[in-house]
Amino acid sequence: SLGSDTGGSIRQPASFCGIVGLKTTYGNVSRFGLMAMGSSLDQIGPFGNSVEDVEEVYKLISGHDPMDSTSLTEEVRGRSKEGGRKIIGVPMSFVNREGVDDEVLKNFNESIDKIKSTGYEVKDVDINQLEKALSVYYILMFAEVSSNLARYDGIRYGLSHPGETSIKSYFESRTAGFGAEVRRRILLGTYVLSSGYYDAYY
């Protein structure tokens, strides 16, 4: 099956269910037809019972799509396959943290060993700004949610809910069409995009 992942909506459910989920690299899989939430973060990816299953689905859905302006061309995608050293960076200080299950850490380290055995060089990288990543994620995601979902007004796009006036119809459509969490994200996104709060968040 397929899912969309903005901040973990493929990877985390897959982990909880004991299956494999892949958030694909930006631009490798078309997002045409996807209702955008956070455009710089949203990606479509497969779920499967094994890495091999996920790989097969990925081969089918990846590739350039002229209907998606963020979709990478085959020429650009091919550059990453050109010669040179095969290096993968792993932020080990982030992996070796309190609270990581021993079995998860064991499987992770075994995966690193398998990667090395295929000819890749694995380097420990220091991402010293990682502790700020969640704050940055929330600001970007909320702002993009507010912008992207503004079009779903029940007139041009989305669910249309009747009301006594056009204004009431607009409010009813937004209320009926979006759940509480989505409405919260829209509100917070509108807040962080307000000019008066620019210095506070950016």
Segments the model singles out, each with a brief description of its role:
Residues 23-106, 168-172:
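A short helix-breaking turn/cap at a secondary-structure junction
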Residues 85, 89, 143-202:
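Short helix-loop capping/hinge segments that flank enzyme active sites or metal/cofactor-binding pockets
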Residues 11-17:
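Structural signature of FAD isoalloxazine-binding scaffolds in flavoprotein oxidoreductases
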Residues 89, 117-137:
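Short connector loops at secondary-structure junctions
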Residues 100-126, 154-162, 168-173, 202:
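Acyltransferase
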Residues 17, 23, 52-59, 109, ...:
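Predominant activation on well-ordered alpha-helical scaffold segments within soluble catalytic domains
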